[in-house]
Structure formats: structure tokens, C-alpha cells
């Protein structure tokens, strides 16, 4: 089976915006992969077609028949690769000061258990970018970490689709924090 770097398998505007953010911040780009768990953008991956979103290739119907949730799948796939709670493990690292996470509501469902494992003192490192439904699906004590983006982003130059909203809002946030300020008008 041939493999390619993860960043070449995932395409579309959402990935382009996430790549832009990683490059701008000189940060590591990672993907929440339904099939492979949390993976770095350079990780070799086989082509596959699996999602937690409401699409024909979704794992949701299969999980539902088993009485399981997407977060159970995330736990199992990461345990299979011997990387339990990989987001919590990153948050625990002292050398990592900031973690920006952009996920759709469906992918919030996927990583919810992992997020819940993040220690209280590591949570301030996080900034979460998701939709209003995504915020509602976050573990309750993480909702305050969700950046307050809403449909007003659609009237900006970063207008787009619901599917790429989390990554567009993350890009907007980074553009704002990275922009030089004019101290005379501040």
C-alpha cells in the first residue's frame, strides 16, 4: 500500500487555512484523523475514506449500532497506535505553550474524551475554534476556551462554508494577533 504525507491527503480550504496558520506561527500542523488518530502533517498515511461527519463513509451509524460514541472510536484508534489521549499528552508538555484546535462539531464529538483528560492547569494553553454547535458539544469546562466566532465572520474577506468555518476563524484569530499594531491609535 502506498503512502503519502498526511498534509497531501487532506485538501480543501480548511487545510489550506490550517497550513497557513502553522506556517505563520512556525508551529506543527496536526490532523484529527478518524482512521489514524492524531497525526502530524508529515506522517506517511495510506489513502483511506473514513469520517465521523454525516457522510456515506461515516463511522457514526456503525458505532451507533454498537452503542458507542465517536469519542470511544478516538480512544480505541489512538490506543491501537499506543498514543492514548494524544491531545492531553501534548497539553501536558512543558515545552508547548499554545495549542490552537480547529474542529467541526462532528470532530469535537470525536476528541471529546481526549479533551476531558487535559489537566486543569494545562487548559489555558488551548484556544478552540469551532461552530456554535461545536461549542455546545465541548466538555462543559472547555466551552470558555472556545473563541467567540459566529456568523459575522461570513461578512469578512474570510467568508466561506460551514465546513471550513473552524479553520477560517483560527486563521482570522492568528491574522489579528500577528498583525502589527499602530500604537498611536491603540
What are these regions (language model features)?
Residues 1-52:
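A glycine-rich, hydrophobic loop/mini-helix early in the fold
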Residues 102-106, 130-132:
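Structural motif
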Residues 123-125, 130-186:
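C-terminal accessory extensions appended to soluble enzyme cores
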Amino acid at each position: 500500500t502506498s503512502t503519502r504525507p498526511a498534509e497531501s491527503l487532506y485538501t480543501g480550504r480548511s487545510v489550506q487555512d490550517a497550513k497557513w496558520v502553522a506556517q505563520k506561527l512556525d508551529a506543527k500542523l496536526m490532523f484529527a484523523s478518524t482512521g489514524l488518530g492524531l497525526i502530524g502533517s508529515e506522517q506517511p498515511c495510506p489513502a483511506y475514506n473514513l469520517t465521523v461527519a454525516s457522510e456515506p463513509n461515516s463511522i457514526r451509524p456503525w458505532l451507533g449500532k454498537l452503542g458507542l460514541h465517536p469519542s470511544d472510536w478516538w480512544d480505541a484508534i489512538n490506543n491501537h497506535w499506543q498514543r492514548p489521549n494524544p491531545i492531553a499528552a501534548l497539553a501536558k508538555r512543558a515545552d508547548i505553550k499554545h495549542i490552537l484546535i480547529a474542529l467541526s462539531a462532528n470532530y469535537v464529538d470525536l476528541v471529546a474524551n481526549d479533551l476531558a483528560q487535559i489537566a486543569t492547569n494545562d487548559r489555558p494553553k488551548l484556544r478552540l475554534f469551532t461552530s456554535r454547535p461545536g461549542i455546545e458539544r465541548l466538555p462543559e469546562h472547555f466551552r470558555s476556551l472556545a473563541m467567540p466566532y459566529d456568523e459575522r465572520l461570513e461578512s469578512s474577506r474570510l467568508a466561506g462554508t460551514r465546513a471550513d468555518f473552524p479553520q477560517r476563524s483560527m486563521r482570522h484569530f492568528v491574522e489579528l494577533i500577528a498583525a502589527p499594531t499602530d500604537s498611536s491609535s491603540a
